[in-house]
């Protein structure tokens, strides 16, 4: 019952009509009344009040009790309340009722009910008829009408048992509830009874305590003094009533008698030990000494004992005289108490067991004494000096346990100690072995495990606990340091001599006993172990002091975990050194890894063949690199390595490419650390080489990479055919390449900073936040040549970045691209430019003395041509031999122009009239033919200049003029226009033609001329009469045309033509004969040729409307034009120039895309027209 019942015993529930229902059971509080029950009478002093504690308390307070008393201890503390018991019983009843209903429902029904023939009241109930009695009271069914089937009886039995069980339970609950009505008063009485019994027990305990105290003080009781005896002794010095026996003392022995008896005793001892008891003497006592009437048995390193005899009878016992220990430290003499104890004990053993028992007893006693001396010294060491609080000494009967390094942190879980005890000397089967007596035995337990075959020397002659501990600790230190050394030395870093590791062991241990590990350069971590404390410490290096030593000391197993901590110490030192190392401004150490740890493991463990050691990675980045690239230094026992890696896509996802760098730890050493310079060189070369690999792979170009040199230079070899593919000539033939088979790319590292970049780096970084310039790399490409003799015209330096070595016969191309940009596109462009240069140089070489090269570089080629050709006069049809020589003209080819190759001619050059065609040819496959073309066409163009000059006088009289139209480099048209009543016009085409391997100029009337076949035409008549039918110096008439040599014949031929046509100037035209001339049917040209021909004819048709216009060359006016003619000429010239440019572009595209079709079309055109020349400018 809870305490609330005691405190509110006089109260009732505030609402008696209300009751709480728990699991269907109504719970009502039971009021505990304090009124006396009926029939109870009062006592002698008045009525009896049951449980009225409140009145009693008020009476005590009224009596003047000022101090409150302690509350009585209630027996109902921690007792289950009645309400909980009733609620649990209600829950139990409810659950049992549910189980009963389910069990009854699962039982089978009676057969009569299933058949519809139920009897008795069951049937009546089903049919709705209830037997009623008097006044409507239902009648009880008679026994004959009850359902007596076995199923129903079984169900009724179950219900009856259930009701009986619950009834018994609730009856008990009712009894408890009824009793609980007076539980408050009864509980208080019990509390009071318990309290009084406890007080009574205190009286009994006090009594017995006094009795025990009296018994325990008996030793302190002082007897009453004997004053009478004391007075007599102090007065007279004797007591007369004490008895005196009157014995006479024996006379003392003389010296002779003493020597005699001693001699007799020695003789008897010799006889007894030699003859009678020699076999019973223990083996350690076989060597003994007899002197002074005694025999002295000695056990080396243990004790000496003196024995004697008192009788000549050999069966009598020996007697103990003296016992001395002969080990040190030991007491010089025994105390009286110890001597008396040993003497009594030894004499008893000699009487019962003889000499063998005496030896065993004294031997065991000595061993125990030695163990005690070891224990005494151990306790003294643990309290003084360096051993204070480092030892824990424990005596175990005759054994001694000494735990050392008790305060060391790494030995708390696995303690180490030595155990010194006595070995029985018995064999394995428990039998005594006389040859092996008991002895001291030492056992060493290291880290909680016994060390077998430790072979620790134990000096029992000179006992020194400190020396013994030092010997054991020396073995332990050697074990720890050797285990750490073996663990480290087996790793690849030290096995491959990449780091220094040494072990020094001294016995006994001292500070020289240490493990020395190289951290970086001359820096070493010297690990030692304190022999007294057992703690690890680092010597000679304050940075490696308390922190890292404590970390090792807290390890549970230093043997396996200390190597990892030492490696972490090296990582820390390397990281600290790298962060404090002076570095360029563009280098920085990243605070965290730019890629996940799994990717870093993939890189570091790519070189791990068998084991994967823990590692530490330091990441660096150069601000002049692309963000995807970074450098990494991995430190591990597998080896320190430097890596260059490229992140894939977004930084922080994965590593795409990584490469190991050949950087050694010595590169980090001061004062001149080459780390960052080597790192920059290695990483820059790798980035550009990898970028070039990607480009080569994408373009399906074969390549190979050679092994990198120690200085970081890398080499890639590609096929020159891939950089310079063989291109067919316009005639369809394929020219052999001039370059060697391979092109070697050498990556030389970062390019030196330019002065502008240096000045920018020195600027104030706080002024403007600038984006750092990209790092540039130096790359050299070596292109060999197959025939060095062809390149004798080249100088050593062709350009700022292009060199030619005549002795070795190769070109050296130097590049300085941005880091990570690669050079494959630049290399291809530069090699193609070099190929273009080689073609021109080859062409210049083939021309020999006809062309004089002045400057040959990759950007510009300057040469002159024209020396040695004779000059002819147009007024004289025949050239004057031995006349003035023509001057040389200079040509400048700008190979580095923005629009391609630019042809620059000096003022007055005859070829200025075809400058547009020259520039177009220079940017096509005909570039290498330009030098030959200049030489081949120079006589023609100089003759054309003289032709223009000869018509100046005729033009001044308005009698006629002439001008030249250039349709291509090898096709031009001369138009002669004469004045008169009707405009008279003739056009002559000049084209080269190959006959028997010789190139000649062929001149004929243009096919577009309508009077080409008109025999009555005045131009046909005079040309046929004075030109087509004659031959001269270097030219020959062909009936309707003429051919001339390119060098000596074209000038005289043009002079003859010019003289014939000028003769018609100023003459009236002949009368026109109306004859219809049937034009020959021309073959249908190819559609492409028709389009080109239409474009070419269009400007000619426009020119025919006004034959007296100025010269056809834009910007050239050799004659004084009439008013209005100059503007008309300029407009027409610009229109012709635009048409020619469009025509050139169309021709070039047509030639590049449909080269074969163009060749076939040219062949068909040549077959249809025999007058079409074949142009070969070589």
Swiss-Prot record:
What are the Polar residues biased-composition ranges? 1-12
Query: Is Oxidoreductase given among the entry's keywords?
Result: no
Q: Which GO terms describe its biological process?
A: regulation of transcription by RNA polymerase II
* Cell inner membrane as UniProt keyword: no
PANTHER family the record matches: MEDIATOR COMPLEX SUBUNIT, MEDIATOR OF RNA POLYMERASE II TRANSCRIPTION SUBUNIT 14
What this protein is reported to do is described as: Component of the Mediator complex, a coactivator involved in the regulated transcription of nearly all RNA polymerase II-dependent genes. Mediator functions as a bridge to convey information from gene-specific regulatory proteins to the basal RNA polymerase II transcription machinery. Mediator is recruited to promoters by direct interactions with regulatory proteins and serves as a scaffold for the assembly of a functional preinitiation complex with RNA polymerase II and the general transcription factors.
Q: What is this protein called?
A: Mediator of RNA polymerase II transcription subunit 14
Source organism phylogeny: Eukaryota, Fungi, Dikarya, Ascomycota, Pezizomycotina
Per the record, the gene is RGR1
């Amino acid at each position: 019952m809870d305490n609330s019942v005691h405190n509110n015993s006089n109260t009732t529930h505030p609402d008696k009509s209300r009751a709480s229902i728990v699991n269907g059971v109504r719970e009502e509080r039971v009021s505990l009344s304090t009124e006396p029950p009926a029939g109870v009478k009062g006592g002698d002093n008045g009525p009896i009040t049951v449980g009225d504690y409140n009145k009693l308390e008020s009476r005590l307070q009224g009596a003047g009790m000022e101090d409150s008393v302690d509350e009585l201890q209630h027996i109902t503390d921690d007792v289950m309340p009645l309400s909980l018991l009733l609620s649990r019983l209600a829950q139990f009843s409810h659950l049992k009722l549910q189980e009963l209903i389910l069990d009854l429902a699962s039982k089978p029904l009676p057969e009569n009910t299933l058949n519809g023939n139920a009897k008795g009241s069951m049937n009546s109930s089903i049919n709705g008829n209830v037997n009623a009695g008097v006044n409507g009271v239902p009648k009880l069914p008679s026994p004959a009408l009850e359902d007596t089937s076995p199923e129903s009886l079984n169900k009724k039995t179950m219900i009856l048992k259930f009701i009986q069980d619950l009834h018994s339970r609730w009856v008990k609950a009712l009894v408890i509830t009824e009793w609980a009505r007076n539980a408050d008063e009864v509980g208080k009485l019990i509390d009071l009874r318990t309290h009084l019994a406890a007080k009574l027990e205190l009286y009994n305990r006090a009594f017995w305590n006094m009795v025990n105290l009296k018994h325990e003080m008996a030793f302190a009781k002082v007897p009453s003094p004997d004053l009478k005896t004391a007075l007599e002794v102090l007065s007279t010095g004797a007591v007369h009533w004490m008895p005196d026996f009157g014995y006479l003392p024996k006379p003392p022995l003389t010296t002779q008698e003493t020597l005699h008896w001693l001699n007799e005793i020695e003789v008897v001892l010799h006889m007894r030990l030699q003859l009678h008891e020699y076999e019973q003497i223990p083996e350690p006592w076989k060597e003994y000494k007899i002197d002074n009437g005694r025999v002295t048995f000695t056990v080396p390193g243990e004790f000496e004992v003196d024995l004697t005899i008192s009788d000549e009878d050999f069966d009598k016992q020996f007697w103990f005289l003296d016992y001395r220990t002969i080990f040190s430290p030991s007491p010089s003499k025994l105390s009286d108490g110890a001597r008396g104890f040993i003497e009594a004990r030894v004499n008893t053993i000699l009487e019962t067991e003889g000499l063998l028992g005496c030896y065993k007893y004294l031997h065991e006693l000595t061993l125990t004494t030695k163990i005690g001396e070891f224990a005494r010294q151990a306790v003294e060491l643990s309290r003084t000096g360096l051993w204070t609080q480092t030892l824990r000494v424990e005596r175990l009967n005759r054994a001694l346990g000494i735990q050392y390094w008790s305060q060391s942190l790494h030995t708390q879980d696995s303690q180490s100690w030595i155990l010194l005890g006595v070995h029985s000397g018995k064999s394995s089967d428990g039998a005594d072995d006389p040859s092996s007596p008991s002895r001291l035995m030492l056992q060493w337990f290291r880290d909680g495990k016994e060390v077998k075959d430790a072979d620790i020397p134990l000096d029992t002659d000179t006992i020194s606990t400190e020396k013994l501990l030092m010997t054991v600790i020396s073995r332990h230190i050697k074990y720890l340091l050797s285990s750490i050394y073996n663990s480290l030395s087996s790793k690849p870093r030290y096995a491959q001599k990449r780091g220094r590791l040494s072990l020094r062991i001294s016995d006994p241990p001292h500070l020289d006993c240490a493990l020395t590990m190289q951290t970086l350069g001359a820096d070493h971590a010297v690990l030692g172990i304190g022999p007294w404390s057992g703690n690890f410490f680092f010597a000679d290096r304050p940075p490696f002091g308390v922190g890292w030593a404590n970390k090792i000391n807290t390890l549970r197993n230093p043997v396996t975990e200390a190597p990892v901590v030492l490696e972490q110490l090296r990582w820390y030192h390397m990281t600290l050194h790298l962060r404090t190392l002076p570095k360029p401004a563009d280098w920085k150490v990243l605070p965290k890894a730019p890629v996940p740890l799994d990717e870093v493991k993939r890189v570091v463990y790519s070189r791990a063949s068998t084991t994967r050691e823990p590692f530490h990675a330091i990441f660096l980045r150069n601000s002049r690199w692309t963000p995807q690239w970074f450098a990494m230094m991995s430190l591990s026992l597998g080896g320190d390595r430097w890596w260059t890696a490229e992140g894939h896509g977004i930084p922080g996802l994965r590593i795409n490419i990584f490469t190991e760098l050949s950087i050694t730890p010595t590169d980090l050493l001061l004062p001149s650390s080459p780390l960052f310079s080597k790192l920059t060189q290695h990483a820059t070369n790798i980035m550009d080489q990898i970028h070039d690999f990607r480009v080569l792979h994408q373009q399906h170009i074969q390549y190979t990479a050679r092994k990198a040199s120690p200085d970081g230079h890398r080499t890639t070899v590609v096929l020159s055919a891939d950089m310079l593919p063989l291109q067919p000539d316009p005639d369809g033939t394929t020219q052999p390449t001039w370059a060697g088979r391979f092109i070697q790319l050498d990556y030389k590292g970062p390019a030196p900073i330019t002065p502008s970049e240096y000045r920018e780096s020195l600027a104030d970084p706080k002024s403007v936040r600038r984006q750092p310039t990209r790092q540039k790399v130096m790359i050299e490409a070596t292109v060999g040549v197959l025939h060095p003799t062809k390149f004798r015209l080249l100088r050593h330096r062709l350009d700022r970045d292009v060199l030619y070595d005549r002795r070795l016969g190769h070109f050296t191309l130097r590049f300085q691209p941005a880091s990570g940009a690669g050079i494959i596109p630049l290399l291809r462009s530069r090699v193609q430019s070099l190929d273009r240069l080689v073609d021109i140089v080859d062409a210049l070489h083939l021309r020999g003395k006809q062309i004089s090269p002045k400057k040959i570089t990759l950007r510009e080629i300057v040469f002159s041509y024209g020396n040695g050709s004779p000059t002819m006069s147009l007024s004289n049809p025949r050239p004057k031999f031995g006349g003035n020589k023509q001057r040389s003209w200079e040509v400048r080819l700008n190979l580095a122009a923005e629009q391609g190759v630019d042809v620059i001619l000096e003022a007055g050059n005859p070829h200025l009239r075809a400058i547009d065609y020259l520039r177009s040819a220079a940017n096509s496959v005909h570039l290498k033919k330009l030098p030959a073309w200049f030489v081949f066409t120079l006589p023609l163009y100089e003759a054309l200049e003289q032709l223009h000059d000869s018509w100046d006088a005729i033009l001044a009289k308005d009698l006629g003029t002439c001008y030249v139209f250039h349709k291509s480099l090898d096709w031009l048209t001369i138009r002669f226009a004469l004045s008169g009543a009707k405009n008279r016009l003739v056009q002559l085409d000049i084209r080269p033609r190959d006959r028997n391997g010789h190139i000649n100029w062929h001149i004929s009337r243009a096919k577009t001329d309508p009077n080409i076949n008109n025999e009555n035409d005045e131009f046909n008549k005079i040309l046929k009469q004075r030109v087509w039918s004659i031959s001269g110096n270097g030219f020959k008439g062909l009936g309707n045309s003429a051919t001339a040599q390119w060098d000596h014949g074209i000038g005289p031929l043009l002079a003859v033509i010019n003289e014939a046509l000028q003769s018609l100037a100023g003459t009236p035209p002949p009368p026109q004969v109306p004859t219809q001339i049937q034009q020959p049917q021309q073959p249908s040209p190819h559609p492409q040729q028709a389009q080109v021909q239409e474009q070419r004819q269009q400007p000619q048709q426009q020119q025919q409307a006004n034959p007296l216009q100025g010269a056809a060359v834009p910007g050239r006016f050799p004659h004084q034009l009439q008013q209005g003619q100059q503007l008309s000429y300029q407009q027409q010239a610009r229109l012709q120039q635009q048409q020619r440019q469009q025509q050139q572009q169309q021709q070039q595209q047509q030639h590049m895309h449909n080269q074969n079709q163009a060749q076939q079309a040219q062949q068909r055109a040549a077959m249809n027209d025999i007058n079409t020349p074949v142009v070969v400018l070589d």
